[in-house]
């Protein structure tokens, strides 16, 4: 029956070790994925490539060190379990001795052994609490690593979207440049045929458009160069990823072989410790029967001192594990800082992309505007809109062809004062010409926001257009 229990215990230990190995494999795969994802968004600078190589080397060293620490932890766990079981058995034996025999009160060795047992039990409890805290901390670090992995994957998706967006924008810019060139060549003959009065304005507009096109062409070349560099970096990262994947497969095969050897070594170690424990108990019972009862406490105290030394060595191992955990925490914080830097680079790329589109949009819109609409506005110097200049004593009154709400008014020069009867006819003809000009401008194009125009609601019965009081020249200057 004890053999069956020992077999079950060994099977449970083997399952636990397999579970730990699976967890380590998963952690290794996650760290490899993190390294792969962190290598993709690197810029063209050599410092980032060197940093990626250093991180990969550090990660490889950490894997090797982690495997060694895992083996040490397993050895220490087995040793702690064996020591705890022996301590429990010794406590049971001590209780049996205390119940079966009467020890005099003046026996100092017995009191010393009890105090040592209490102190050692307290130390064991502290070590248990420390181990529990370490396990919890390791679980938190694993969760944090998983969160960082998800965040890096989302960032890589966002970078891929930005890259596709930049490519589409480059194609759109190239298409708009071609359309702009064709439109400029098609309108060149029309603008030249309008006469020498607009020739200077056309030359200025053409010069401005050419300057803007030069700027856009330079920006387009810079963006194309950036896209080319990014593609080369992506290809280089993919090549490094393939090589690292091959190395990882070889490393995984070697580590699996090492894990099998480690399991065999642990199994042999467990058998050796079991035989050692049996021989120890046999020697202890022989000595307890051969020596008087007063010396039993000193014997137990000696065994406890040896246990204390072994536990002190285990404590030193735990201190080393704590230092390793602190080192891993600093490494994770460094990776978080690198993630923040990558986010800042993404925001900067978005801002540069928006600036390029904003620079390209005004030039394209400006070239397609009508030449008459692009003329500068004239300032109003105590003038009135021509629409509200009412002729005096003219029969019959001209009828409006449409409602007042649909007429767009453009600023004109101030009207001259009426001095004679002949000036009334001239003013009437000017008013009719201005009205026809306003209707023609409305048919040509919809008024843009850069022109001043007045819109009225539906005409009221018996409506009389009022004369607007425009500010004087001195008031406009003061404002």
Curated annotation (Swiss-Prot):
The keyword Cell division applies. Keywords: Cell cycle, Cell division, Centromere, Chromosome, Chromosome partition, Coiled coil, Cytoplasm, Cytoskeleton, Kinetochore, Mitosis. Changing residue 199 to A: Abolishes dynein recruitment to kinetochores. It comes from the Eukaryota. Disruption phenotype: Recessive embryonic lethality. Hemizygous mutants are viable and survive through embryogenesis, but are either lethal at the larval stage of development or sterile. The oocytes of sterile mutants have extra chromosomes and prematurely exit the prophase stage of meiosis which results in endomitosis. RNAi-mediated knockdown results in embryonic lethality. Transmembrane segments: none annotated. This is Spindly-like protein spdl-1. It comes from Caenorhabditis elegans.
